[in-house]
Amino acid sequence: MKFILLCLDYLDYYARLMLPYLAVFIPLYLLARGCWILRRGQPMEFRHELKLGLLALYALFVLAVTVLPEISLSRGIRFSYAEGSFGPHNAGIQLIPGNFLRYLGFSLKYLGGGALVALIGNLCLFAPMGFLAQRCFGGAWWQYLLAGAGISLGIELFQLLLPRATDIDDLIFNALGMLGGYFLGRGYARLAGRRGHALPKKVKGDG
């Protein structure tokens, strides 16, 4: 129960963190996307635009979780983790794959599971992005593995400039999460295709 509450606390923190950015991002995105559609002179495909919009919003969420500063009237602008700590892991540079697992037991015993939240979060963080990107653009699995690793590498390198930890394990789990999201997207497409084939075809002249 404590672990679930901790997960909810982190989600609540990052949801509130996004609010100032959403107020700026949504109008700019709609304006830019509208101009792009008008310039192309082609009819808008609502479902495709909806998926693109969700992908853009989720990309903003990833940035809010990883690199964007907290903006609030009471605290001003600051770069930090959510309230709490992941323990000894929560600092510096870590370049040994699998080293993060050493802190799971310590975190579960003394810190309420913060490290486990981070591990699951790193694995799941890129999964929705992989799913939405697959639904928007398709592509091969290795492209998503490389994209996940590349995006995560950029984030980890940028975090060298911030009071946050830079960890090779984050990159690994982010890339695997992106790949997992890709396969979820493919699975969804296949299920939707089978469902479409299973529906009875409309007889010409009906209705």
Where are these predicted regions, by residue range?
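Bulky hydrophobic segments
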Residues: 1-164, 182-207
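Non-cytosolic membrane-interface motifs at loop->transmembrane helix junctions
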Residues: 78, 165-176
